[in-house]
């Protein structure tokens, strides 16, 4: 938490009141007594969340504690459950080996009562109300301070449908009451069914505006079929189906304006996010440029998120009631074992389709035991394009020209067309050259001097000569990036997001650059912004090619 009084971040811990049977949040310096009964409290862990009756029923089945948890005070830490303050662990092997169909059948006959749950939650809110008031006050102040210089029309909320963005949105809407702030929902097309239901409920609220950002030019399964399923090391889905789509929507809504975006990012949620700052201005720390990113709940933990939601009776995503700790793409390679089990139980048709796809993929790349490869989650740690035909698209094949200095002959996997020549617009003006060899020349954007000669040799081979430049090697390196784009582009939208002038268009027909909008900044051809010139290099290069 961020302390207003001490103006610094303070570490909090979760304590347990044995008398009231609820968790209480405290810093090391605060008194270790329950504010309800005044009894001493005992340190439990660093963070917990409430376990709803639907999840309790599942835990009873998995832990062989039939009927023992419904009237208990049940909470969950990162891995461990706590029942009336005592730890209960469910081994990962139990989750992996669990029979989803048997569990589903048992859950059908369960009845859920919220009586004891509501009683425990009421005490949880009462025992922690002063803490909630403090963090809410601090968050509101932060939001007001950060938004002072921005117009209402230049402020947005990045909304995922998860608990963190739900709390962030509520804090922002309350702090900026009277203003209608746009909520941009990045629909990856892989959201949980209950997330879509939640978004539909929110659309009925006239006080907020939900804008859906979706990449309609691409299909997840078709792309996964070409470049393999996403993995922890190869999360191509994030940019293709979320960041790129959101960036495209933001460009339509805000143009080149510098905007303020409120995100539901928390420092303790992951190692990656722990390296972020609460307020980000530097482009290298943001997935989407031209915005100031602010995170009101940056110092909050999960305990505080749920305290805010339940105390303020905010509508939230029902997926959390089932046992999800995080709600995002239901088939995410970063999903926990419990999340995968929940998908098998509650989204069985979609899960079966995904499972069959993964098994087929394992067979195609030559895995000896494809079913086991999927069961143990080995696909989640795969890297590169081993076994995939598309891997050849990022393999640059060229040779030095023996008859022309500074010339190289490049082999292509896609035929030469008009869009191929447009890939050279970032280097300068593309004009017709010697018509007898179908040459195109690229004139330097400043001097007007020819710097590149493009000479098609056949449909799949081109000779490119660099002219009148000091560093021919650097220019050929950047040219090779455009060659790889031509061969490998899968419409991931990364290049669209890199271009600050909206000159790049990516659609079902491919990659195109508008010569009237391009400012020749060459960010789109630089490895600084796009490693290897195309994100597919990261996802499809094999170990041999990466050396």
Map each language-model feature to its residues.
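C-terminal accessory/binding modules appended to enzymatic or scaffolding proteins
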Residues: 482, 489-500, 504-506
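Nucleotide-activated chemistry modules centered on ATP-dependent adenylation/adenylyltransferase
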Residues: 1-158, 163-483, 505-511, 516-519, ...
């Amino acid at each position: 938490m961020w302390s207003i009084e001490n103006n610094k971040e303070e570490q909090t811990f979760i304590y347990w009141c044995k008398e009231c049977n609820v968790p209480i949040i405290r810093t090391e310096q605060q008194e270790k007594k329950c504010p309800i009964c005044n009894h001493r409290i005992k340190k439990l862990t660093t963070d917990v969340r409430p376990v709803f009756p639907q999840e309790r029923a599942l835990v009873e089945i998995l832990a062989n504690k039939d009927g023992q948890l419904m009237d208990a005070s049940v909470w969950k830490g990162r891995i461990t459950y706590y029942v009336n303050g005592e730890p209960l662990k469910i081994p990962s092997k139990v989750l992996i080996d669990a029979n989803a169909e048997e569990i589903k059948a048992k859950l059908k006959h369960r009845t859920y009562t919220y009586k004891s749950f509501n009683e425990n939650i009421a005490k949880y809110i009462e025992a922690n109300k002063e803490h909630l008031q403090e963090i809410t006050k601090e968050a509101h102040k932060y939001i007001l301070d950060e938004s002072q210089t921005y117009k209402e029309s230049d402020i947005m909320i990045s909304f995922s449908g998860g608990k963190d963005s739900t709390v962030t949105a509520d804090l922002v809407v309350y702090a900026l009451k009277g203003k209608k702030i746009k909520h941009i929902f990045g629909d990856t097309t892989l959201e949980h069914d209950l997330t879509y239901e939640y978004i539909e409920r929110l659309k009925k609220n006239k006080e907020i505006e939900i804008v859906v950002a979706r990449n309609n030019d691409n299909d997840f399964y078709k792309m996964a079929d070409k470049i393999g399923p996403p993995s922890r090391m190869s999360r191509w889905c994030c940019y293709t189906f979320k960041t790129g789509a959101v960036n495209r929507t933001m460009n339509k809504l805000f143009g080149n304006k510098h905007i303020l975006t409120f995100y539901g990012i928390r420092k303790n949620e992951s190692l990656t996010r722990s390296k972020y700052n609460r307020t980000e201005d530097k482009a290298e720390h943001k997935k989407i440029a031209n915005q100031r990113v602010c995170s009101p709940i940056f110092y909050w933990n999960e305990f505080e998120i749920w305290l805010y939601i339940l105390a303020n009776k905010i509508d939230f995503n029902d997926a959390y009631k089932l046992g999800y700790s995080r709600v995002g793409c239901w088939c995410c390679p970063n999903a926990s074992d419990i999340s995968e089990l929940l998908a098998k139980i509650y989204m069985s048709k979609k899960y079966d389709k995904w499972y069959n796809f993964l098994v087929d993929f394992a067979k195609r790349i030559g895995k000896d035991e494809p079913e086991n490869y999927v069961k143990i989650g080995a696909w989640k740690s795969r890297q590169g394009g081993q076994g995939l035909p598309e891997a050849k698209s990022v393999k640059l094949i060229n040779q030095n020209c023996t008859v022309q200095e500074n010339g190289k002959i490049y082999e292509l996997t896609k035929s030469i067309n008009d869009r191929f020549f447009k890939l050279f617009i970032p280097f300068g003006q593309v004009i017709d050259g010697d018509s007898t060899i179908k040459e195109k020349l690229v004139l330097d954007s400043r001097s007007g001097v020819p710097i590149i000669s493009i000479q098609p040799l056949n449909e799949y081979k081109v000779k490119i000569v660099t002219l009148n430049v000091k560093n021919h090697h650097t220019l050929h390196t950047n040219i090779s990036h455009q060659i790889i784009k031509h061969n490998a582009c899968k419409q991931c939208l990364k290049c669209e997001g890199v271009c600050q002038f909206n000159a790049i268009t990516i659609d079902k027909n491919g990659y195109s650059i508008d010569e009237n909008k391009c400012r020749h900044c060459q960010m789109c051809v630089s490895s600084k912004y796009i490693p290897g010139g195309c994100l597919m290099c990261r996802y499809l290069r094999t170990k041999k090619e990466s050396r």
